[in-house]
């Protein structure tokens, strides 16, 4: 896996700038699986140094989303650890980063830049006008003695601190997912990036690297969008004389049509949305593990323990993964069908409560009734949010002209009068029924078909609409049993009355 000795230590270090993107969960999951497979530690660190994009409550959303999926951490903001604090703003307040930036300044490997944003914009515009495609900033202060820089700063001028990148030579690093091949970047293609903002707050490039070193991170697994920034990180590791971690840049997740990456700005992929729609955490866990990783190219349904046992970094693919909502939905259906009736009822209950079909808290009677209905939808359910609609007619009145159009009662090749006759016969037969179980109801209604010399389809279809208000519903005899004798007969009577007005 790598030449690094000792326990594997990996981290997920999100920025609290909004809801956690499903791609972020994939990054966290791969790090978590790596830690669990190799017997290491998984660390959660909140990188909140971007004050402008900081969203209050986002850090809590990140933690809640990870826990919902089933990802826990060995060290982090709420569980502590030997290398805390695990929130960058708190680390900044403790002065953790200052000695390291001072070290770079003293060594002439970083410098204070007094170039303003306006001047920088003018330089970019001038470069563009001159036909220079890639503007690379090198501040004039990079050649100033440190004493002069400090004098300028003491005068009150605002400044940033920039990395003094070499003008010559090349920077090399390896990426485990890209076969360990060496990636070579010419240093004259780099620029002097900002390490410390004018507010004194460190930027990602600097803060994450110091934190990774101090927290003894051995493997840096992150999205491939960070590959172009890695030369700067490698330079910093080398400037400090620190051992480099193993870099493993995860493949992008493309939209289903392959046109661009999944985006939390353009695509409905906030983790919370999948939870709201009724995707099981087991589904998300399993599906995301397959976004850029494969066990044998065939096996797809795997438990947490199986994924931990089978996961290796060598099986992560460098080519982009492709998001497939239909496949995710199908997988969710598979996991739903793995649940027992009682387990599914418990998962469905909050959705029924939000729909106003069941009280909150639910009574024992309500729970028992829901459990009795679950077998009717267990095989059909693919998202838990579908349950209230599928079960609504068991809880709400079915009224002709409101719930459904009375004309929907009429089967093909039948008229209203013929349908009234069918439903009257059904109402009469069921009125005499005392055993209201699915087998007994089926026996009675099939016998009625023979007596009337009609095919089951038209009669059963008309009864189904009368009872449920729909042409598609769970099996008819189970539905009648679930609705109950009194309500079933009442709905049949209402359907007959409505049809008589059409006849």
From Swiss-Prot:
Transmembrane segments: none
Gene3D superfamilies in alphabetical order: 1.10.10.350, Glutamate-tRNA synthetase, class I, anticodon-binding domain 1, HUPs
Annotated positions binding ATP: 264
Enzyme Commission number(s) from the entry: 6.1.1.17
GO biological process: glutamyl-tRNA aminoacylation
Record keyword Ribosomal protein present: no
PROSITE patterns the UniProt entry points to: AA_TRNA_LIGASE_I
Catalysis: reaction(s): tRNA(Glu) + L-glutamate + ATP = L-glutamyl-tRNA(Glu) + AMP + diphosphate
Keyword Ligase: yes
Compartments in which it is found: Cytoplasm
GO-annotated cellular components: cytosol
Motif 'HIGH' region: positions: 14-24
Main location: cytoplasm
Top-rank EC class of the record's enzyme: ligase
Motif 'KMSKS' region location, chain numbering: 261-265
Keywords: Aminoacyl-tRNA synthetase, ATP-binding, Cytoplasm, Ligase, Nucleotide-binding, Protein biosynthesis
A molecular function (GO) term: ATP binding
InterPro entries on file: aa-tRNA-synth_I_cd-bd, aa-tRNA-synth_I_codon-bd_sub2, aa-tRNA-synth_I_CS, aa_tRNA-synth_I_cd-bd_sf, Glu-tRNA-ligase_bac/mito, Glu-tRNA-synth_I_codon-bd_sub1, Glu/Gln-tRNA-synth, Glu/Gln-tRNA-synth_Ib_cat-dom
Subunit structure and binding partners: Monomer.
Function of the molecule: Catalyzes the attachment of glutamate to tRNA(Glu) in a two-step reaction: glutamate is first activated by ATP to form Glu-AMP and then transferred to the acceptor end of tRNA(Glu).
PANTHER family per UniProt: GLUTAMATE--TRNA LIGASE (PTHR43311), GLUTAMATE--TRNA LIGASE, MITOCHONDRIAL-RELATED (PTHR43311:SF2)
HAMAP family attached to this UniProt entry: Glu_tRNA_synth_type1
Family: Belongs to the class-I aminoacyl-tRNA synthetase family. Glutamate--tRNA ligase type 1 subfamily.
Protein's UniProt name: Glutamate--tRNA ligase
Organism: Chloroflexus aurantiacus (strain ATCC 29366 / DSM 635 / J-10-fl)
Gene: gltX
